[in-house]
């Protein structure tokens, strides 16, 4: 049985270890780091992803420090989560702990996990600790950044409300994204989440010269692999990175231990923060934010914390808040985050999605019924929301046009039951006009994507916000009532719809 520490010993343990050699021309803080670095401990207990390590007196690593050990020839990183007393720490493993044994040596790096950052990460896939996993050689960058950072201070944040123009009509008109905002992307399987994400990456690179970072958190490895190859096929990235690559990928997929899944979103965010601090407008994608919470809950139980509601970790709101508050606009640049959100059992009151909702500025809802009509992007114009759709932010004209478009679509939705039972002939003249306009609006909300050119054969279109407003304003005011519905399907600006109508008329003649 371990002997209880005397008050004298306890006081000694609290003191930082005295450096073995006097560090010449170094500050006191730097000396402390040097003293802590290289401290060697030994594994005392392994429970799944949680590993306990004992250190010599006075050499205890700080909370969140990265420890390293060799696991059958592989570098295994452990992150300090708790100080247990008796000079022991409890750590979370970032990879599988199979093969670890008690008594094994563990070295303190003296700093949190740091990952490569900068342009060299574009086109590459990294894991949670910044190692390349795309079999394209080492990452050629010396710049590294710790994954645990404080949120920007109030004085460094930009308070101006600006919209990020994506070039996608339905998003820019009805649920615009805030620069430095957070967007929730809701949608089932096969409705076009990945294609929409890739188009956003492409358009932000073209329109703003900005980069994107994609964090795959606890999703299927197959999907991550597909996304990587689709990005290469559509020209968003090049294999092995290099000139022309627009996105960095960071993966911690379903097969990874909970430690990796709980930290991989922070690794991706750190890469995005570096681009922001270099003056870029960055898009940061997280697929799926629910898995970040789920991994935190697994780790929490292993650390011996008492669970809160529905078995989630007691620190749920804190974990989410610490990450989300780092996603913001500063005076240098912005990080706009698009987060895919899985809702367990479609229960929106579940603590995990409910905690995410509190941080969102906009929601983009993809609908299967719209996808079934062949309208892509399959964004639901009545279900998607944004707090940026405010006359004070987007202007009076944009706001009025958006509300009229939604009003027309809502009226069409209300009339659909009558049309299904009695047919169009039973509607009043006014309702017939409203339905005809709504059907044209529905089709005009579709748009050919650059990244889908390979499949559709139609050249992609990036539509300026002014052209989007002008087109829909004309539609709701009845200026294009004489044009056929087909003219509005899969075009960019309203001028293209008019041209298409002329072509259709010529073909019919």
Curated annotation (Swiss-Prot):
One of its GO terms (molecular function) is proton-transporting ATP synthase activity, rotational mechanism. It catalyses: ATP + H2O + 4 H(+)(in) = ADP + phosphate + 5 H(+)(out). InterPro entries: AAA+_ATPase, ATP-synt_VA_C, ATP_synth_F1_bsu, ATPase_a/bsu_AS, ATPase_alpha/beta_chains, ATPase_F1/V1/A1_a/bsu_N, ATPase_F1/V1/A1_a/bsu_N_sf, ATPase_F1/V1/A1_a/bsu_nucl-bd. It comes from the Bacteria. Its main location: membrane. Keywords: ATP synthesis, ATP-binding, Cell inner membrane, Cell membrane, CF(1), Hydrogen ion transport, Ion transport, Membrane, Nucleotide-binding, Translocase, Transport. Residues 1-28 are annotated as: Disordered. Pfam families: ATP-synt_ab, ATP-synt_ab_N, ATP-synt_VA_C. CDD domains: ATP-synt_F1_beta_C (cd18110), ATP-synt_F1_beta_N (cd18115), F1-ATPase_beta_CD (cd01133). It is a peripheral membrane protein. It is found in: Cell inner membrane. Its EC number is 7.1.2.2. GO terms for cellular component: plasma membrane; proton-transporting ATP synthase complex. ATP binds at residues 187-194. Produces ATP from ADP in the presence of a proton gradient across the membrane. The catalytic sites are hosted primarily by the beta subunits. Belongs to the ATPase alpha/beta chains family. F-type ATPases have 2 components, CF(1) - the catalytic core - and CF(0) - the membrane proton channel. CF(1) has five subunits: alpha(3), beta(3), gamma(1), delta(1), epsilon(1). CF(0) has three main subunits: a(1), b(2) and c(9-12). The alpha and beta chains form an alternating ring which encloses part of the gamma chain. CF(1) is attached to CF(0) by a central stalk formed by the gamma and epsilon chains, while a peripheral stalk is formed by the delta and b chains. This is ATP synthase subunit beta. It comes from Sinorhizobium medicae (strain WSM419).
């Amino acid at each position: 049985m371990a002997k209880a520490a005397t008050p004298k010993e306890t006081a000694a343990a609290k003191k930082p270890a005295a450096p073995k050699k006097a560090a010449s021309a170094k500050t006191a803080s730097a000396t402390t780091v040097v003293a802590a670095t290289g401290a060697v401990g030994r594994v005392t207990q392994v429970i799944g992803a949680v590993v306990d390590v004992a250190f010599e007196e006075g050499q205890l690593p700080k909370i969140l420090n990265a420890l390293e050990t060799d696991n059958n020839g592989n570098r295994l990183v452990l992150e300090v989560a708790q100080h247990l007393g008796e000079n022991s720490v409890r750590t979370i493993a970032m990879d599988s702990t199979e093969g670890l044994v008690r008594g094994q040596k563990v070295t303190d790096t003296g700093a949190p996990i740091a990952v490569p950052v900068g342009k060299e990460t574009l086109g590459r896939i990294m894991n949670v600790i910044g190692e390349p996993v795309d079999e394209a050689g080492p990452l050629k960058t010396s710049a590294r950044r710790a994954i645990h950072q404080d949120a920007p201070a109030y004085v460094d944040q930009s308070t101006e409300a600006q919209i990020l123009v994506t070039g996608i009509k339905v998003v820019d008109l009805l649920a615009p994204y805030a620069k430095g905002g957070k967007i929730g992307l809701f949608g089932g399987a096969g409705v076009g989440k990945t294609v929409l994400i890739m188009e956003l990456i492409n358009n932000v690179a073209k329109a703003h010269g900005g980069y994107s970072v994609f964090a795959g958190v606890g999703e299927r490895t197959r999907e991550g692999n597909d996304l990587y190859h689709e990005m290469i096929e559509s020209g968003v990235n090049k294999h092995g990175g290099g000139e022309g690559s627009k996105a960095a990928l960071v993966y911690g997929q379903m097969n990874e231990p909970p430690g990796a899944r709980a930290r991989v979103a922070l690794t991706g965010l750190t890469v995005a923060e570096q681009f922001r601090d270099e003056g870029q407008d960055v898009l940061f994608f997280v697929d799926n934010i629910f898995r970040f919470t789920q991994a935190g809950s697994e780790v929490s139980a292993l650390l011996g914390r008492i669970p809160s509601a529905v078995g989630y970790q007691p620190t749920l709101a804190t974990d989410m808040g610490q990450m989300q508050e780092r996603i913001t606009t500063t005076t240098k640049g912005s990080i706009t985050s698009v987060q895919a959100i899985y809702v367990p059992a479609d229960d929106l009151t579940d603590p995990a999605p409910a905690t995410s909702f509190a941080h969102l500025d906009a929601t983009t809802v993809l609908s299967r019924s719209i996808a079934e009509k062949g309208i892509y992007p399959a964004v639901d114009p009545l279900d998607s929301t944004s707090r940026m759709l405010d006359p004070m932010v987007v202007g009076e004209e944009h706001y009025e046009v958006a509300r009229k478009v939604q009003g027309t679509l809502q009226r069409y939705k209300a009339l659909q039951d009558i049309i299904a039972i009695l047919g169009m002939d039973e509607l009043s003249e006014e309702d017939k006009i409203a339905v005809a306009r709504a059907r044209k609006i529905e089709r005009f909300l579709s748009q050919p994507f650059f990244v889908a050119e390979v499949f559709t054969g139609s050249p992609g279109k990036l539509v300026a916000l002014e052209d989007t407003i002008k087109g829909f304003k004309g539609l709701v005011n009845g200026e294009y009532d004489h044009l056929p519905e087909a003219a509005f399907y899969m075009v960019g600006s309203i001028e293209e719809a008019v041209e298409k109508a002329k072509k259709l008329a010529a073909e019919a003649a």
